[in-house]
Design a protein with these regions (language model features):
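Short active-site oxyanion
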Residues: 2-3, 78-80, 143, 161-163
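Short glycine-/acidic-enriched loop or helix-start segments at secondary-structure transitions
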Residues: 15-16, 59-60, 92-94, 140, ...
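Short alpha-helical
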Residues: 11-12, 89, 107, 151
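Compositionally biased, intrinsically disordered low-complexity segments enriched
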Residues: 9, 91, 132-134
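Cysteine-nucleophile active-site neighborhood
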Residues: 50-118
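Active-site-adjacent beta-strand anchor residues
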Residues: 7, 84, 129
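N-terminal beta1-alpha1 cap of cysteine-dependent amidohydrolase-like domains
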Residues: 1-79
């Protein structure tokens, strides 16, 4: 399987995702659209991973818009997609959701709490690194997956293929 990763900062790479891919014999390719504006072709993608970053989906960068086009194309191809932080915001916005300033900043490690058992084996509570103030709408047809003490929408699952 070819896993294409969209990385949005030089310091926040695929980490455990890379290890999992290597252990399971998958090919992993990392793209830096913020730096070069280059994105993978959906035809050369078996799974799409969109990582976090300091920007907002509402920033006026052409590469952010093209990234959402890629997300929509991957959804149309029924590819598995995983988005973390900015990645989840980009998926929500690509599906017509609103991303806006939440009025609160979440910075540092804090727990998120499981709200759905749509994905088997997830813990009821897990400590994750937060570094954001934007919040996203849960897309139509998706199910709330995680919430934190400060923000209800911390993660969602859709059609068991988009997380």
């Amino acid at each position: 399987m070819r896993i294409n990763v969209l990385q949005h900062t030089p310091n926040e790479g695929p980490g455990a995702i890379r290890s999992w891919a290597e252990e399971n014999g998958h090919e992993l390719y990392v793209y830096h659209p913020y730096r070069y504006g280059i994105l993978p072709d959906v035809e050369e993608t078996d799974m799409l991973v969109i990582l976090g970053g300091p920007m907002s989906p509402n920033d006026d960068f052409e590469w952010l818009k093209k990234e959402r086009d890629l997300i929509r194309a991957a959804i149309k191809q029924d590819l598995p997609i995983f988005g973390a932080c900015l990645g989840a915001q980009q998926i929500s916005k690509a599906l017509g959701g609103v991303v806006k300033n939440s009025g609160v900043k979440e910075v540092g490690f804090a727990p998120v709490f499981l709200k759905s058992h749509a994905i088997k084996g997830l813990p009821e509570e897990v400590s994750v690194l937060h570094w954001h103030q934007d919040c996203f709408e849960i897309p139509k047809g998706a199910e709330l997956l995680f919430s934190s003490r400060l923000l209800k929408n911390q993660g969602f699952v859709m059609n068991h293929r988009i997380v």
